[in-house]
Amino acid sequence: MAVCSSSSLILLTVFLSVAVETRPSSDRDEEQVLKSLFGPHLTSLILAPPTSNDSTEGSSGSPEPPTPSEAPVLIHGDRGTASQILRSFLRQREKTRRWGRKPMVAGGGCFGMKMDRIGSISGLGC
């Protein structure tokens, strides 16, 4: 019995190894799928190996400081204007917030009466 099961195990292993070797490569299929989805140009970029100047996620290299032409320019006159705009915006929000709230009616919550079950009023809510 042991000889029969070990020989069938060996036969099964040989059969599976031959089946795996004769299977067509899936690399070609992936390339065709990528071409159909993204087009030939993006497919070539996706399949290309990464270059040394590519930054990878989590890389420990420090970013280079921006060149003077790329750096944001702050003019002292604009600074006061920006703060005035911000203050007026915050004041406007504060006014609308005060006028937007309605006084709560006794027993009412944010969305009216709160009911836990049929016929029982809840004190929970906002």
UniProtKB/Swiss-Prot annotation:
Secreted keyword on record: yes
Cell compartments where the protein resides: Secreted
GO biological process: blood vessel diameter maintenance; cGMP biosynthetic process; receptor guanylyl cyclase signaling pathway
Keyword hit for Secreted: yes
Propeptide: 23-102
Signal sequence coordinates: 1-22
Region (Disordered): 44-80
Pfam families: ANP
Tissues with expression: Brain and spinal cord.
Primary location class: secreted
One GO cellular component, as annotated: extracellular region
PANTHER family according to UniProt: C-TYPE NATRIURETIC PEPTIDE, C-TYPE NATRIURETIC PEPTIDE 2-LIKE
Function: Exhibits natriuretic and vasodepressant activity. Has cGMP-stimulating activity. May help to regulate body fluid homeostasis in a variety of aquatic environments.
Family, per entry: Belongs to the natriuretic peptide family.
Name of the protein this chain belongs to: C-type natriuretic peptide 2
Species annotation: Oryzias latipes
